Regions:
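Short, Lys/Arg-enriched, disordered terminal segments
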Residues: 1-5, 483-484
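N-terminal, post-signal peptide beta-strand-biased segments of exported outer-membrane/organellar beta-barrel
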Residues: 18-125, 254, 406-408
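Outer-membrane beta-barrel porins/channels
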Residues: 21-30, 34-35, 105-484
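Single-residue recognition of alpha-helix boundary sites
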Residues: 13-14, 65, 189, 253
Length: 484
């Protein structure tokens, strides 16, 4: 039993916090016009994507329409200076082609003035992040009795995250009175998450100095995939009087319909001498968890938007409150043996290493926007919105793994133009995003590596910056608008 208590302390220093998903609610906005207007669809009808933002505003649509939208491509750059130690940066530059969407709102039979139906299929999350770097240096890590002089230290780190979420929505709206309308939307979310993190470090002796130990090494490798099907409901109200529009949307917490996945994890310590031990030996931990039933939660949210029309200008503002989610277990490893060989004693430590958990803090995202009509066929649009991270970054970091990775706030700035034809409309625009955290914690450190810390240095904090530029294009076809 003493051996496993000792190993628990060792392995906890080797396993970094696990991060793995896009950590923002509003990174991808549905619909090009709504994206350029930073969420103005909360308060008034913008295009057929209203079924997702505020179904009640569909009652203000003057004709049936089908929208084809695509954020055609985006370039993202994330940089963490000295993220793995002095002179060892963590950085990634990635160009992605984002999936498009289709949305439509249609009158129900001949009751267009009383009822409307909307449908949409779109990408709610599309996030890929990959960090990798390697450091080679000469330093004295192992005692000179066993490894005389300095050793060659080689450290490597890789993090690869891929999160995709596709949503299908169907909504219905009805007119309650001259000024009020109501709507309801049901959304089915299909979420797929892939994660891999690897760290390995080696202290290699100089063979010319007759060492008694040739190599000391440590490695941790964890990989998992998690799949979900979730159901989420929205209820909405829209009020319109003169130049003013008001929208209110209540979104219920997501309900799990299906989940599955697997995880494989491994730790190897070779010729290591843990603290308070006089002997060197090698240790091994490995587990494969299959047929998992992971959990994932979206919180309750309440959105309010308001807009006012002037002669050639529409100004909009909105905000969304997201409730908190207390710490919950995403993946429970159960009684799987991790430390090898398996015994009755080491099962109790598995949960401390392999349990995956999450916790969401409450937050409010806000937005403002303007649309200026140059003429009946052309308008200019612009806006900005906040996109705050929702993870609770707990210090000190508890045992087990936390899901989110991008623990920094983001801010989106949008600009574009709308070109209207007889029965169609084109929208072109661009979005610039910026995020930064000045107290971001290193996942690992190569500085001052020591054997007592399993060939790692003490992790510190630094500044991480993220910038992105995304192109936005959409085409809207009006089904029943008469040609001019």
């Amino acid at each position: 039993m003493k051996r496993f208590v000792l190993l628990t302390g060792c392995f906890c220093t080797l396993f970094a916090p696990l991060y793995g998903q896009d950590n923002h609610y509003e990174s991808l906005q549905l619909g090009s016009k709504n994206a350029l207007l930073s969420g103005a669809a909360l308060s008034h009808w913008v295009d057929p994507t209203a079924v997702v933002h505020n179904a009640a505003t569909m009652m203000d649509a003057k004709e049936a329409g089908i929208a084809f939208n695509s954020t055609t491509g985006g370039f993202d750059n994330i940089r963490f200076d000295n993220g793995l130690g002095e002179g060892v940066d963590i950085k990634t530059s990635d160009f992605q082609l984002y999936p498009g969407l289709i949305a439509a709102d249609l009158p129900l039979f001949k009751q267009a003035n009383k009822y409307r139906l909307g449908i949409a299929i779109f990408a709610r999350v599309s996030d890929r992040t990959r960090f990798t770097n390697r450091s080679t240096r000469i330093q004295n890590i192992i005692n000179d009795v066993e490894m005389p002089g300095s050793e060659t230290y080689i450290g490597q780190y890789t993090l690869d995250i891929d999160v995709r979420e596709t949503t299908a929505a169907m909504g219905w709206a009805t007119r309650l009175s001259e000024h009020w309308s109501a709507g309801v939307t049901a959304m089915t979310l299909i979420r797929n998450q892939r994660y891999r993190e690897n760290f390995n470090a080696n202290a290699i002796a100089d063979p010319t100095l007759s060492p008694t130990v040739d190599v000391v090494s440590s490695e941790s490798d964890i990989s998992m995939k998690l799949n979900y099907i979730l159901l989420q409901m929205k209820g909405s109200l829209a009020w319109k009087k003169g130049p003013w529009n008001l929208g209110i949307v209540l979104t219920a917490p997501a309900m799990k319909m299906y989940s599955g996945g697997d995880m494989i994890a491994q730790i190897e310590l070779t010729n290591i001498r843990p603290v308070d031990s006089l002997n060197r030996r090698s240790y091994f931990a490995s587990a494969y968890l299959e047929k998992l039933k992971p959990k994932f939660k979206y919180p309750v949210s309440l959105s309010v938007g308001v807009s006012r029309s002037f002669d050639d200008l529409v100004l909009s503002a909105g905000g969304t409150f997201y409730g908190n989610i207390d710490r919950y277990v995403v993946v429970d490893p159960g009684n799987t043996s991790f430390l090898q060989p398996p015994t009755e004693d080491n099962i109790i430590f598995t949960q401390r290493f392999l349990e995956v958990w999450a916790s969401n803090r409450p937050l409010v995202n806000t937005s403002i926007s303007a649309e200026w009509m140059l003429n009946p066929r052309t308008s200019l649009m612009g806006g900005l919105r906040t996109d705050l991270h929702y993870a609770e970054f707990i210090e000190p970091v508890p045992l087990g793994f936390q899901l989110p990775k991008k623990i920094w706030n983001r801010y989106h700035f949008n600009a574009g133009a709308s070109l209207n034809g007889a029965r169609s409309r084109w929208i072109f625009g661009v979005q610039y995003s910026h995020g930064q955290a000045d107290d971001y914690r290193q996942p690992y450190s190569f500085d001052g590596a020591s054997e007592s810390n399993l060939l790692q240095g003490e992790r510190s904090k630094g500044s991480i910056r993220a910038n992105g530029v995304t192109g936005i294009v959409s085409f809207l076809f009006y089904v029943n608008r008469p040609t001019e």
